[in-house]
Amino acid sequence: MAEMVARLASERAVVVFTKSGCCMCTAVTTLLGELAVSAAVHELDREPLGKEMERELARRLYGSGGRGGPAVPAVFIGGSLVGSTSKVMAMHLKGELVPMLKNAGALWL
């Protein structure tokens, strides 16, 4: 499963793993859309292996036990895990998100 998540996370400059109906997932994807980022979005509750991918994302976010909070949204920029909602929003407020998106080739501004 780790290889599958890594492959999907590298398919575009920005990849977001979400669940439909998740308000925090909507907040992150809306922010990226407003920044004119065309992210690949994978809704885990609509994927055949979504539960397994969610466990892998939780492991990546919170360590080997995979416990510590929700696994979605999980945001990857340039193939690297950035984090979840709080990390992405904090980076945006500090002015760090746009430069990271530019470096990954997700923005052409």
UniProtKB/Swiss-Prot annotation:
Residues 2-108 form the Glutaredoxin domain. This is Glutaredoxin-C13. Gene3D superfamilies: Glutaredoxin. InterPro entries: GlrX-like_pln_2, Glutaredoxin, Glutaredoxin_subgr, Thioredoxin-like_sf. SUPFAM superfamilies: Thioredoxin-like. GO terms for cellular component: cytoplasm; nucleus. PANTHER family: GLUTAREDOXIN (PTHR10168).
